[in-house]
Amino acid sequence: MAKRGRKPKELVPGPGSIDPSDVPKLEGASVPVMSTSYDVVVDREFDELLQGKDGLLVYHKMLSDGTVKNALNYIFGRIRSAKWYVEPASTDPEDIAIAAFIHAQLGIDDASVGKYPFGRLFAIYENAYIYGMAAGEIVLTLGADGKLILDKIVPIHPFNIDEVLYDEEGGPKALKLSGEVKGGSQFVSGLEIPIWKTVVFLHNDDGSFTGQSALRAAVPHWLAKRALILLINHGLERFMIGVPTLTIPKSVRQGTKQWEAAKEIVKNFVQKPRHGIILPDDWKFDTVDLKSAMPDAIPYLTYHDAGIARALGIDFNTVQLNMGVQAINIGEFVSLTQQTIISLQREFASAVNLYLIPKLVLPNWPSATRFPRLTFEMEERNDFSAAANLMGMLINAVKDSEDIPTELKALIDALPSKMRRALGVVDEVREAVRQPADSRYLYTRRRR
């Protein structure tokens, strides 16, 4: 018996789909940028201690912690050590020329006279990583050929940013600054810098133009560690000096002047044990050595150090072996931290590509519709090893050919670009971008 045919179901748009005729409705924004505040949460922060500039002060104090500083040095050492370069929008000669101009303006691979130091941008981004947000004012000057070139970027420290001003749609409009001018007695208050004249770095931005410090999750561990160190120092002092005891006559009653004087003597010794003591003839002062051993506080300190490191994306001091010795395999260490480093490098490059590069290109190429981009390449030993092995196989495959150079070149050109660079093959486009700038890009006046 033939099966009864089923009527095909009518296709209807599912959740999240859109009718092609309604595509134009996607243009424009209906939802303004809104503050991420609710109840005790103010701009993503629920702890009053960490709200506003009071929070910035806490993060600044944390920089004196050895574990925090060590982690920051490692993170930004890795970020800076990557191979940074400017990638043109295409292989078109004009796009390559624009990329070469940006490469020269950013001072990549060259911090000589007439070039802006690329490391200054990293210093500004490091402040954003520590405090959540940092910025720099873009200052252009006229070059020898009439082009507007980068004169300098004036760092704007988070301590000097009083407020971010927004437009009616909730988008950032300006930075409101205040602070004392160095080298003079002038105090600037309410200075507004348009957002388009700045390069802004935000760490862990949620879309509301409110960054969050990378140290935020490390604060509880830092506070506990700080309190623990004070207790350890106080306990060690008691073990070294002893507990003071003062024997007084039985006639001295509580609440009398003599009783208060006895309390003051003991108190002064605790605060200043090296000072001398004057006692009445029938009073006796002594110190008692503590016989019990101090508790081992190292595991607690190690725990909080590990918590601080984990909050910053580094896990090197959480892997422990027997006998309390800390160690970690190099390969495992790289796997634990590499993604943290790469994500920060992308965050840095995205801000430069969004807020800085277009502002250097458009004044000189007003009709430009595409821009070069700052990108990076991590040094990976495994890539070179694999490429070298593959190259050996390719050479062996064509070694008996009468026309080795032509075939070898064709094989090399077929390799992925990253593998060719690992082999040391010259990338003609990248070399054209990295050519030293000529005199047209030099300053017509000396940089201040």
UniProtKB/Swiss-Prot annotation:
It is found in: Virion. InterPro entries: P23-45_portal (IPR054117). It comes from the Viruses. Residues 1-25 are annotated as: Disordered. GO terms for cellular component: viral capsid. The keyword NAD does not apply. Keywords: Capsid protein, Viral capsid assembly, Viral genome packaging, Viral release from host cell, Virion. Homododecamer. Interacts with the capsid protein. Interacts with the terminase large subunit; this interaction allows the packaging of viral DNA. Forms the portal vertex of the capsid. This portal plays critical roles in head assembly, genome packaging, neck/tail attachment, and genome ejection. The portal protein multimerizes as a single ring-shaped homododecamer arranged around a central channel. Forms the portal vertex of the capsid. This portal plays critical roles in head assembly, genome packaging, neck/tail attachment, and genome ejection. Belongs to the P23virus portal protein family. This is Portal protein.
